[in-house]
Amino acid sequence: MSTVNELVNLVDETYDISQIEKEIGLDNIALSDLELLATGGYSSLTGFLGKKDYDSVVETLRLDNGSVWSIPITLPVTEEVAKSLKSGEEVKFVNGGNVYGVIQIEDIFVPDKEKEALLVYKTTDEAHPGVKKLYERPNVYVGGAIVLTKRFENNPFPSYHLDPIETREEFKKRGWKTVVGFQTRNPVHRAHEYIQKSALEIVDGLFLNPLVGETKSDDIPADVRMESYEVLLQNYYPKDRVFLSVFPAAMRYAGPREAIFHALVRKNFGCTHFIVGRDHAGVGDYYGTYEAQEIFTNFTVEELGITPLFFEHSFYCTKCEAMASTKTCPHGKEDHVILSGTKVRELLRNGEIPPSTFSRKEVVEVLIKGLKKEVVTE
């Protein structure tokens, strides 16, 4: 499988829904999944998973046909709604009074959520945000092919909201043969910058693709993060080598499995490489530091269709007076300033200003201003 894989396109705004009476209400996660299914972000999926594919993904990290897919993309409905549905019929998708699409129902089944939690998230602990969300959502899954009949009008970042076909076009226009994708749900701190620029030394372009779907409550809000990315790129990155666009999916916090998922999706957006750092898509202490890198050894680059780039934990070294990692710095822990999104968030929420070894001053200014605004509106 190469990176020029065929993109699924299931957007049809002329689709006749006038005769379809039944409807399924979508929550924000299902709504963002619907968009990514339709625009090809989740290629080769053509709909919400039926039982065969669901079981296969949960147990083997592959679809029933053998291709790699690590996160079950499911459509949960209540028992009450499920009783009114039957296989073979078309049902409308609604959210906030709008009809967004249609599903051709192929499957209605009750999943074993405990098994899903254990295999996908490696825990059944409800303190884990992914597990908590899994248990909170309804208990019956509906599988089937979808059509997106209406594009979302209220995207919070319209100029940065590009479909995979558009990002591929953009990379082509820029003449980029190799593109590295970077996934983030945090403001970019100096450790991220170091990793991104190290990767940029060996490829033509960097695709900064922050996730702006549903995240946990203590993550920094997407609008504040977007502003922080803008000032960072403006001041510290070569403009012709970086492209910023949002990833509208929800965060699953599934660690290693989500790292595979994030790589596959970035392949669909047109990336040839994908950065996997320490504890990618992790939360708390549920996953080992490099577990999200180790999981890639189960798959060949050919079947993934994208090359992962693994980076060690980086830090600021007071002796080197530079960003470094254990691969490039001989000094001991006492000389290392450890940077993390969690640490930056913590300092900011306590009203402390992160040092310049942590974050660029322009970024810090944006974050402080944004978080003050957030406190005022709460």
Swiss-Prot record:
Keyword Secreted recorded: no
Gene Ontology annotations of biological process type: hydrogen sulfide biosynthetic process; sulfate assimilation
Keyword list, A-Z: ATP-binding, Nucleotide-binding, Nucleotidyltransferase, Transferase
Catalytic activity: sulfate + ATP + H(+) = adenosine 5'-phosphosulfate + diphosphate
GO MF annotation list: ATP binding; sulfate adenylyltransferase (ATP) activity
Pfam family, one: ATP-sulfurylase
Pathway membership: Sulfur metabolism; hydrogen sulfide biosynthesis; sulfite from sulfate: step 1/3
Keyword Transferase set for record: yes
EC number: 2.7.7.4
NCBIfam families listed in its UniProt record: PRK04149.1, sopT
Assigned protein family: Belongs to the sulfate adenylyltransferase family.
Name the record gives this protein: Sulfate adenylyltransferase
Origin species: Bacillus anthracis
Species lineage: Bacteria, Bacillati, Bacillota, Bacilli, Bacillales
Gene (name only): sat
